[in-house]
Amino acid sequence: MSITIRKLDSTSEGFDAALRAVLAFEASEDEAIERSVAQILADVKSRGDAAVLEYTNRFDRLNADSVAALELPQDALQAALDGLEPKARAALEAAAARVRGYHEKQKIECGTHSWQYTESDGTVLGQKITPLDRVGLYVPGGKAAYPSSVLMNAIPARVAGVGEIVMVVPTPDGVKNDLVLAAALLGGVDRVFTIGGAQAVGALAYGTATVPAVDKICGPGNAYVASAKRRVFGTVGIDMIAGPSEILVLCDGTTDPSWVAMDLFSQAEHDELAQSILLCPDASFIERVEKAIAELLPSMPRQDVIRASLEGRGALIKVRDMTEACRIANDIAPEHLEISALEPQQWSQQIRHAGAIFLGRYTSESLGDYCAGPNHVLPTSRTARFSSPLGVYDFIKRSSLIEVSAEGAHTLGEIAAELAYGEGLQAHAKSAEFRMKG
């Protein structure tokens, strides 16, 4: 099957501009969506349950008589787990265990514990770590049902010590996804409401008589959900506004080209705007990958999506060497970075910007998506330059601790008063000086 993927060469004139054109993506804001979301959020904030019920019945074609009727009991989650095929249940439980194990280790290693120290004059300084009280988890419904995302969002929140996890998931026409509900149970979700869209985001942000207000909202969704999350940010925290999925493969030419082709497919099949790029110093290997793509594409159920993605936003790039590949990779700052090489550790030392780094030819990105353990909620659209994967640290907050002794009040008071007078803030200065006299 014929497919045309953009091919670039880093030695060619105009390469930098061509690469920028490949990477260019700006999420468009649909004015109709923005207006609709603004109206829905205002309505939910004003009318609470009544608005949530009205929108849910309309958009999901339901006939519920109350929002309370849209909450699923824990028994329903247990029934969903018990009803899974044995292999599906075993896989889900294994993935949950691995994700939990990784994030428990992360909690130990990543500064998620309170600390303090005492100065010579008795003054105590430190930091208090507190988990969030309540977190909301948005889960897409219908065809885009991803139980793995439930695990990746719920488990780090649970490990962090979040008091309550509230999940919302739409059920169009009343159809529930047992894998999603089973994942909610395994992930430690406390409450599940079968609501979705902007109205669900509004309910979580503002609270209603039935749906409790949360402190942070996490999880993927469509354009309406993304718009709603942007609008409620500030009232609550959010994880991120994710762009299209991305994979960048750095290969030294020693991997089976069909493996690389399928890795590129693994992101391209998400949607037409997903981006899959190969960097390789071996021109003949790039040709073999190109051939493998053409041979394998007809066997893919989502071949039309893959084709559109690869032709529209994909690229096969010839580089001078692996050192240059690493430099370009840092500029791209991809969501997923595979280093498919004989000595991946050597090259990983040169990588500064990537959401997740997959080392070695046996480490397919899909293993990270589902069951390796690290979180698959990753920064996209070059935000890996300043952002990190979702983790335990996203569900805690830090408070500074200051306990000043009498001696410390004199020493620090002189400094504070001098600076406060310099800023023209007399009450600040006097507040410090009063304690110097005591």
UniProtKB/Swiss-Prot annotation:
Substrate binds at S245, Q267, H270, H336, D369, E423, H428. Zn(2+) binds at Q267, H270, D369, H428. Disulfide bonds: none annotated. NAD(+) binds at Y138, Q199, N222. GO terms for biological process: L-histidine biosynthetic process. GO terms for molecular function: histidinol dehydrogenase activity; NAD binding; zinc ion binding. It is an enzyme of class 1 (oxidoreductase). Binds 1 zinc ion per subunit. SUPFAM superfamilies: ALDH-like. Gene3D superfamilies: 1.20.5.1300, Nitrogenase molybdenum iron protein domain. One of its GO terms (cellular component) is cytosol. The keyword Hydrolase does not apply. Keywords: Amino-acid biosynthesis, Histidine biosynthesis, Metal-binding, NAD, Oxidoreductase, Zinc. The active site is at E335 (proton acceptor), H336 (proton acceptor). Its EC number is 1.1.1.23. It holds the Pfam family Histidinol_dh. InterPro entries: Ald_DH/histidinol_DH, Histidinol_DH_CS, Histidinol_DH_monofunct, Hstdl_DH. Its cofactor is Zn(2+). Pathway: Amino-acid biosynthesis; L-histidine biosynthesis; L-histidine from 5-phospho-alpha-D-ribose 1-diphosphate: step 9/9. Catalyzes the sequential NAD-dependent oxidations of L-histidinol to L-histidinaldehyde and then to L-histidine. PANTHER family: HISTIDINE BIOSYNTHESIS TRIFUNCTIONAL PROTEIN, HISTIDINOL DEHYDROGENASE HDH. This is Histidinol dehydrogenase.
